[in-house]
A protein has these predicted regions:
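NTP/phosphate- and nucleic-acid-binding module
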Residues: 1-473
Length: 473
């Protein structure tokens, strides 16, 4: 199935019907762009996180992990500029009172314009000059001036609400790493270069979230802050671009569905020396940002050092120098890359059986390391349940295993195909034999491959090693 034939509705319907993702708080009418990961979705998303941690922490000789608090000292966000300037440009339609993001209105009507490089005043002037930019709700060109809308969720700590109790839900996980730089370097005794990786929730009060789990107000980030000596940063910037792209390719994303887009100088954040986005060809847009890799220089550590009065310098024993490290940041949204894996894996195959009857097989070609279940155990008859459950219980010590003894074996195969289970293990009467008839058990099972639908017979004792070999990437 070509990428252009897929639609977001196909992905959403499969996720809702098979327990990957449900609308949040659905029995109360839901909450806009709030999604809950169901029984399959939580296993799938956990596997995405495990795959990232495996390559970025476990196998990397440079990186260590961290799990920082969601609610931080509010001075953190004053220092970084989030309190004063982490804002979206909002305007209202005077005719129908609908509220919109100005940059989105401009970008949708004039994709040739680099909106990221425009100031709020420049956006105001551009919209005023272009009457083809109209309200998507009522079609009128009559807007209020742009105003700032801060994206941080504000909360309060303690029993009273006043300015001294104000805190924020973190809009990014990166700052938890920066404020812990000295602690991590001291306790791990790491020398530069080294990185700190974190998986965690972040919150942004987006005015126009959408496209399923692509953009939500509550989301999970997988970020690495890689600290290096100034002057070596561009070399490491190139290293991490390749490393990130190879991780995606190793887990089944096709190279032709990825592109690396370097930010133009006008797009760059004022503290950034270079930024590249790895973009994916999502079915609902031409290209969508998947992964941002940025050279943040020493901006963050310098700001925190100045504001806190605590030294965040690194002493280089080889050169006898003190300096503030530069930072390369590969920042990936877990929910967004999970959606990309689902879009990539989704397929509808048109099949014809031996009688000439046509059928459509819906299948998720997920990499085995990402699939919610690594395998499913299917007894050919419920009479074989004891042996089948014995196999299931043994394999479940090592990975997630599904068990299904309801319906024809063909229908059970199709159910497992649709949820992405890479291997189905069929227990039949030859497996257990028949002592009364003098037929010895062969202690073998049939293993069916999801993608090829081919079947092989193998001893039960070889199942664990066989499946584990397929999970590697």
């Amino acid at each position: 199935m070509e990428q252009s034939e897929k639609t977001l509705d196909m992905i959403v319907n499969l996720c809702k019907n098979r327990g990957y993702v449900f609308p949040g708080s659905e029995i109360y009418g839901g909450l806009a762009n709030s999604w809950d990961y169901g029984p399959l979705g939580v296993e799938f998303k956990n596997n995405v996180k495990k795959a990232w941690l495996k390559k970025f922490v476990q196998e990397s000789p440079y990186n260590v992990g961290l799990d920082a608090a969601i609610i931080m000292n509010p001075q953190t966000w004053v220092t970084t500029g989030h309190v004063s300037s982490f804002s979206d440009p909002l305007l209202d339609c005077r005719a129908c009172k609908a509220r919109h993001r100005a940059d989105k209105l401009i970008g949708e009507e004039h994709p040739e314009v680099n909106v990221d490089a425009m100031s709020f005043d420049e956006m105001d002037a551009f919209i005023a000059e272009h009457e083809d930019i109209v309200c998507p709700v009522c079609g009128k060109h009559d807007f209020t001036p742009i105003r700032k809308f801060n994206l941080m969720f504000k909360t309060a700590i303690g029993v009273t609400e006043d300015s001294s109790s104000t805190c924020y839900l973190r809009p990014e996980t990166a700052q938890g790493i920066f404020v812990n730089f000295a602690n991590i370097q001291r306790t791990t005794r790491r020398k530069l270069p080294f990185g700190v990786c974190q998986v965690g929730k972040a919150f942004r009060n987006e005015i126009t979230p959408g496209n399923f789990t692509f953009r939500t107000r509550e989301f999970e980030q997988m970020e690495c802050e890689f600290f290096c000596k100034p002057g070596t940063d561009l070399e490491w910037f190139a290293y991490w671009k390749d490393y990130c792209e190879n991780w995606l390719l190793s887990l089944g994303i096709k190279k032709e569905h990825l592109r690396l887009r370097d930010h133009e100088p006008a797009e760059l954040a004022f503290y950034s020396r270079a930024t590249t986005d790895i973009e994916y060809a999502f079915p609902f847009t031409d290209w969508g940002e998947l992964w941002g890799i940025a050279d943040r220089t020493n901006y963050d550590l310098t700001r925190h050092q100045e504001a806190s009065g605590k030294s965040l310098e690194y002493f280089d024993s080889e050169t006898n120098e003190h300096y503030i490290p530069y930072v390369i940041e590969p920042s990936l949204g877990c929910d967004r890359v999970a959606l990309a894996f689902l879009c990539e894996a989704y397929d509808e195959e048109h099949l014809t059986d031996s009688k000439g009857k046509e059928d459509i097989r819906t299948v998720l070609h997920l990499h085995p390391a990402l699939a919610p279940y690594m395998c499913a155990v299917l007894p050919l008859s419920k009479k074989l349940g004891e042996k089948a459950m014995e196999i299931r219980n043994e394999l479940s010590k090592y990975f997630m295993v599904d068990y299904d003894d309801t319906g024809s074996i063909g229908k059970r195969y199709r159910r497992e195909d649709e949820i992405g289970t890479p291997y189905c293990i069929t227990v039949d009467f030859d497996t257990v034999g028949d002592e009364a008839k003098g037929i010895a058990a062969d202690n073998c099972v049939t293993v069916r491959d999801r993608d090829t639908m081919e079947q092989v017979r193998m001893p039960i004792s070889e199942l664990k090693a066989y499946i584990e070999s397929k999970i590697e990437f």
